[in-house]
Every structure is written in C-alpha cells, then in structure tokens.
C-alpha cells in the first residue's frame, strides 16, 4: 500500500476518533495554494463557545526516523497550516469568531497477520498521542 493511502487511512482513523468524542468534522484535506489541513473539526461544549480545531495527522510505522511524526511539524509546516487556516476562515466567515487551535494527532500503524481478528483490512492503527493546541499561531 502506498504512503498516501496509509496517510489517508490514518486521517480516517483520527476523524472517526474525533467524532466518537463529540467533534463534528467540517472538512477533510482542505487545501489552497498555501497548503493543506488534514482535518477541520468543530466542538461545542455545553452550549458554550464553539472550538475550531485544525488537525495535522502524522501516521508512522514503528521505528520511524522522525519521532512518530513530531519532527515533521516544523516551523515552516506550522506557518503553512496557519496560512491555510486563514484562507478557510476567509471562505467561511461564520466560523471566524470561533476559538481556534492547532492540534496534532500522532498515529502508529503496523501490518497485521491473518490471525489478528481484531483488525480490519491490512493494518492496525493506534492513536499514540493527541496534542490539543500543539502549536500557537496568530489568526486574525
């Protein structure tokens, strides 16, 4: 399976997890000329203010070289995500007053054997870490 397909499956896994914890998925793979945001999700707590999360998903196999994907969230990558988030908010001005944050989801995957009845498909995914407000950007 290609790297792109694995990444998409990791994003599917995180989107399902977010939905199971009360988040609404607004967009998947939102892109513009500046970059792409894997998942944009909204959550409202007890009829209070809504939170908008711009989620970067990093899906890695065991023994990877970049600390489970954490090493790939460089300052340059953060700036691209911030610019893309600004484009999203300009396109959807009704969301501009929401509390915004930038989250990172670290997902591990591994191939499964024929005897592993708990997994579906060729791979087993596990959310290693979900980091809310993993980095700060200034959105106006």
Swiss-Prot record:
Matching InterPro entries: Restrct_endonuc-II-like, tRNA_endonuc-like_dom_sf, UPF0102_YraN-like
Family statement drawn from the similarity comment of this UniProt entry: Belongs to the UPF0102 family.
Superkingdom in the source lineage: Bacteria
Entry-linked Pfam families: UPF0102
GO molecular function term, any single one: nucleic acid binding
SUPFAM superfamilies assigned: Restriction endonuclease-like
Protein name: UPF0102 protein alr1796
